[in-house]
Amino acid sequence: MPVFYGTRVESPLMLGTAQYPSPAIMAEAFRASRAGIATVSLRREGGAGQDFHRLIKDLGIPVLPNTAGCHSVREAVTTAQMARELFETPWLKLEVIRDDDTLCPDVIALVEAARVLSDDGFQVFPYCTEDLSVCGRLLDAGCQVLMPWGAPIGSGRGLNNPYGLRSLRAHFPDVPLVVDAGIGLPSHAAQAMELGYDAVLLNTAVAKAGDPVAMARAMALAIEAGQLAHGANPIEARDMAAPSTPLFGMAVLG
């Protein structure tokens, strides 16, 4: 199971709390997923009040507040400080977005905000791209976890750049890595784990599915399968065929 900032979590599935048809379905989906962490947006969910916060606490798993919707370092830092006070945790999923069309991370502001928040005692989980230089700068800024996107948030496209994600894993073998955003199908989640990633964070794929509870269970099984596959040392892909049946012992006719 993954370890983040010295804390071991019970599942490599990290699940968001937004967009569900109802609070009851959200809670049932969390139970079906056996998620290890619940992510919460202070800005997007703040209007739900104490009932929502009580529901999150009743899930009984660690909470990872995020700064979704922030477009500047100042916004992200202010939101982070409010989240730490409300949820009583130093953990923070840091999002600083360049524009609302792509929801692409603003990597320059992201690194700056990560440095400010790390210096203030936050344990930062940065939502970033798979760019090696950016990820290196985030580690230099104090981050001990990296959360590269698979594809744009909510797109459901899966892993747009498996090569880049594989390279990131190889370059930082000892850093906890989480594929965050873009997951649409259980096969996408399994692929991330097959690449050797420590966890997967998703939300829309479950919350907006026709049956969120069934999809949550499917994601849990896929992540388990991908993790087992990675640990089994799978064969390398090759361009040419390789016979699976040995010639030894075959009858010689004629």
UniProtKB/Swiss-Prot annotation:
It is an enzyme of class 2 (transferase). Pathway: Cofactor biosynthesis; thiamine diphosphate biosynthesis. 1-deoxy-D-xylulose 5-phosphate binds at residues 154, 181-182, 203-204. It catalyses: [ThiS sulfur-carrier protein]-C-terminal-Gly-aminoethanethioate + 2-iminoacetate + 1-deoxy-D-xylulose 5-phosphate = [ThiS sulfur-carrier protein]-C-terminal Gly-Gly + 2-[(2R,5Z)-2-carboxy-4-methylthiazol-5(2H)-ylidene]ethyl phosphate + 2 H2O + H(+). One of its GO terms (cellular component) is cytoplasm. GO terms for molecular function: thiazole synthase activity. Its EC number is 2.8.1.10. The active site is at 93 (schiff-base intermediate with dxp). It holds the Pfam family ThiG. Homotetramer. Forms heterodimers with either ThiH or ThiS. This is Thiazole synthase. The gene is thiG.
